[in-house]
């Protein structure tokens, strides 16, 4: 079993000093608004990380959409190689936001 203390030691040896870390805790898994560390302790996720603030961790609709997309294309930079879902999202956002 990993411990937060042991992982902090590994981090100290492996991660550049310029990469900050607020809490000496390492996440093992998350669901909805809860996160469990590598020692099994449960926390409420008050950090609201990218892609989970509105839906929580592992929202079933988000998981399904990601799985569907990964079967087609995992990632590309739209400015280099464009793809249709990006256009569809922009069109949808433009319909909801006022202005020209």
What is each residue range found by the language model?
Residues 1-31, 86:
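Active-site-adjacent loop/helix segments that line or gate small-molecule/cofactor pockets in enzymes
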Residues 5, 9, 33, 41-44, ...:
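Short amphipathic alpha-helical segments
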Residues 21, 38-40, 69:
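Hydrophobic alpha-helical segments with strong N-terminal bias
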Residues 25-47:
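Active-site and channel-lining beta-strand-loop segments
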Residues 42-100:
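Glycine-rich loop-to-alpha-helix module at the N-terminal edge of alpha/beta enzyme cores
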């Amino acid at each position: 079993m990993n411990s937060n203390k042991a992982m902090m030691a590994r981090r100290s040896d492996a991660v550049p000093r310029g990469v900050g870390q607020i809490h000496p805790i390492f996440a093992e898994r998350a669901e909805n608004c809860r996160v469990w560390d590598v020692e099994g302790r449960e926390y409420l996720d008050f950090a609201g990380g990218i892609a989970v603030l509105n839906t929580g961790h592992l929202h079933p609709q988000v998981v399904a959409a990601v799985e569907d997309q990964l079967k087609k294309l995992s990632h590309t930079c739209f400015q280099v190689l464009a793809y249709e879902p990006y256009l569809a999202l922009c069109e949808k956002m433009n319909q909801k936001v006022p202005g020209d």
